[in-house]
Amino acid sequence: MKIKRKGLVLVSLLAATAMALVGCSSPTTPATASGASSFNAAVDGIVNPSTVKGGTVKLLSSTDCDSWDPQNTYYGWCWNMQRLFTRSLLGYQKVNGSKPVLAPDLATDMGTHNADFTKWTYTLQKGLKYSDGTDITPKDVKYGIERLFATDIINGGPASYFLATISHPADYLGPYKSGDLASIVTTDSTIEFNLSTSYSDFNYLMAMAASAPVPYKVEGGTGFVGADYGKQPVSSGPFVFTKYVPTQSVSFVRNKFWKQSTDKIRKPVANEIDLTIDSDENDIDSKLSAGTADARADLDVGTTLKSKILTNPKVKVNADNPTTAFTRYLTVMPSVITNVYCRQAIFYAANKAELVQAFGGTTAGVAAGSMTPPTIAGHSATANMYSSGKDNTGDVAKAKAALVKCGQPNGFTTKVAYATPSQLAPKVFASLQTALARVGIKVTETTSAASSYYSTFIGSPTNIVNQGIGIAMAAWGADFPTGYGFWNSIANGADIVPTGNTNYPSLNDPVVNKILDAAPNGKSTDADFRKLDDQVMKDAVYLPILFGKSLYYRNPRLTNVTSDNALAFGLYDFVNVGTGGK
């Protein structure tokens, strides 16, 4: 997933480049039996457990979501916020701070499948209702997923998984232009998916926000359909999406038609959760420090609050530093830098030691020699195809040799893209610029607002070429914890789309494609994903920088605080957070 940001990624899933990947080197202190606050207490525990209801939780973010449409969002923090007002057939449940597991949400159980994983059937619970009191039906779940096929309208979410697995005519363009999709069969209480290929991980798709129901009869109401649905999405969860002012604020108030008896995943206690969007990172830090805001919804803390956390034990007890399953990297575009040796020159010349420092120092994460993070199949702790030397400052000699091979012995010029606002991305750019200049590669910066960076700036292959973007900052976390969940969206050549493309370099390598195509059948092993990682590195399109950690801060007044580790970067699970009724 995209790590906005967060800087998900993924996360991430951010702009991915806007994220403050900061952490602390102190050992983790587990939550005590009483749930008392301590450093890292929310990572694998629950801080201040409470059943007291009422109050308003006050959240901040530096940018708006890429979309509030559940089918059209791909930022990890926005997936986390979707848990407030949308539900899906399945979801992630975290009991008493344990690791999250898949669990039924709208469905009565985990569903059933046939022997070859090509047919999946789920039964909906009775008594499920939207915030307007109307029934949630299997047809609504079907309609929401059909919307993913309307890629001319819904082009920012994880549609590639669904398009690659659910059987459909080649000319099916979603419900707006093509109507009903016959391969998804519904009754009054069940929904059946007929797939075009075996897919043993299908339950993970049913836990995505993209599987949330959308009322097929009215969608978002008059004027809020298609691309505008994200301005007024219908609520199926415990909170109602309301008072939305784009790029400024949104509120979530209790859904009187939601029933705790139908929801074993969420246990909300707050009356209201307010999100204020503030592009001033220092202002966000100040509000968190002063206690006028409760937590940041999208990113790590900024540099000012980070310093306080690292130096003041009284502040540190209210912070958490989860290790995250995402990789921060630079995408080197073969459509702009066409010669593989020219791309390799960038890999060798990059000063990873300085890049890690620019991202927040050693507390930001561990320098990466390959793309696959430690928690995902195919990871190798020793892989490092483009060695940056013993001190990770780059191998200038090898970079110059690669430039000779690509016919550019004196270097070349290109552009580096990143999302704004960001405290760190300009520092990362400056570090990269200095390192590449050592071998004659000259770079200039080009930026885009975080809200459009992934969808239409680097998410558009045509725009990459038109803008001459040779390098783009990004970060990625697994959409679900498998090799396929990490790699498919960023490396499968079959899933390249005109906008909202997450395979930023438009990689279409037959070796990579073959492994990914075999994965849904359960035929790709850890060794295969190790081979995939090696092949991607040979293609020199993804330059891994670090495996990340994040630093978050929670207001001491908050209750029921725990990390949502189902996402790539451990943000707090805000749906269950309270204020002790205040």
Give the positions of each predicted feature.
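Bacterial lipoprotein signal-peptidase II cleavage site
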Residues: 24-33
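Surface-exposed binding/hinge segments that line
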Residues: 123, 142, 147-150, 154-218, ...
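Gly/Pro-rich hinge or "lid" segments in bacterial periplasmic/extracellular proteins
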Residues: 94-97, 198-267, 272
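Detector for C-terminal structural segments
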Residues: 245, 350-381, 424-434, 460-582
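Structural transition elements
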Residues: 239, 363-405, 420-427
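Extracellular/periplasmic solute-recognition and catalytic clefts
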Residues: 155, 242-253, 262, 274-335, ...
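N-terminal lobe/hinge region of extracytoplasmic solute-binding protein
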Residues: 58-115, 234
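Alpha-helical secondary-structure segments
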Residues: 58, 136-146, 188-194, 198, ...
